[in-house]
C-alpha cells in the first residue's frame, strides 16, 4: 500500500477497493473509525512523514505528533496549510470538525480544540488512513 502512485483524478473506487484493506476502505471512504489503541501509529515514534493511504499526499510530520492519551495518533498541526480540508460532522449525535485529505477527500479523523501549544489543536487521526515514510538519515 505504501507505493501508491495514483494522482488526483485517477483514483477510482474500484482501485481503492483492490488496494486497501476492507478496514482502511471503511475508514477512508465511509468515514469509519478504528478502535482506540488498535492502530499501528498511535504509539509510533520514528522520524518522518505520514501520508494519505489513498493518494500518497503528505499530511503530518512526526515533529508535530504528541501523545494525547486518546488511543489514536494525534498531531498539533498538519505538514502544510493546504494538506487538509475540514468539514462539519453532525453524525452520532455530536457536532465535530471532520478532517479530510485535501487532495483526494479521504476521511482521516477529527480535529478538536484541546491540543497543546502552539496551536491548541488536536488532530485525532485514524492509523488506517495513514502511510508512514521514514526520514532519510
From Swiss-Prot:
It comes from the Bacteria. Zn(2+) binds at residues 52, 55, 101, 104. GO terms for biological process: protein repair; response to oxidative stress. One of its GO terms (molecular function) is zinc ion binding. Residues 13-135 form the MsrB domain. Disulfide bonds: none annotated. Binds 1 zinc ion per subunit. The zinc ion is important for the structural integrity of the protein. It is an enzyme of class 1 (oxidoreductase). SUPFAM superfamilies: Mss4-like. Keywords: Metal-binding, Oxidoreductase, Zinc. It catalyses: L-methionyl-[protein] + [thioredoxin]-disulfide + H2O = L-methionyl-(R)-S-oxide-[protein] + [thioredoxin]-dithiol. The active site is at 124 (nucleophile). Its cofactor is Zn(2+). Its EC number is 1.8.4.12. InterPro entries: Met_Sox_Rdtase_MsrB, Met_Sox_Rdtase_MsrB_dom, Mss4-like_sf. One of its GO terms (cellular component) is cytoplasm. Pfam families: SelR. Residues 1-33 are annotated as: Disordered. The keyword Metal-binding applies. The keyword Zinc applies. HAMAP family: MsrB. Belongs to the MsrB Met sulfoxide reductase family. This is Peptide methionine sulfoxide reductase MsrB. It comes from Thioalkalivibrio sulfidiphilus (strain HL-EbGR7).
Amino acid at each position: 500500500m505504501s507505493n501508491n502512485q495514483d494522482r488526483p483524478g485517477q483514483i477510482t473506487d474500484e482501485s481503492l477497493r483492490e488496494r486497501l484493506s476492507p478496514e482502511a476502505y471503511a475508514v477512508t471512504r465511509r468515514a469509519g473509525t478504528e478502535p482506540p489503541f488498535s492502530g499501528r501509529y498511535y504509539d509510533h515514534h520514528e522520524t518522518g512523514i505520514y501520508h494519505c493511504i489513498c493518494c500518497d499526499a503528505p499530511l503530518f510530520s512526526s515533529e508535530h505528533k504528541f501523545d494525547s492519551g486518546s488511543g489514536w495518533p494525534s498531531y498539533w498541526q498538519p505538514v502544510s496549510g493546504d494538506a487538509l480540508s475540514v468539514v462539519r460532522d453532525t453524525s452520532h449525535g455530536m457536532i465535530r470538525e471532520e478532517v479530510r485529505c485535501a487532495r483526494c477527500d479521504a476521511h482521516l479523523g477529527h480535529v478538536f480544540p484541546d491540543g497543546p501549544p502552539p496551536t491548541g489543536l488536536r488532530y485525532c487521526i485514524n492509523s488506517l488512513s495513514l502511510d508512514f515514510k521514514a526520514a532519510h538519515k
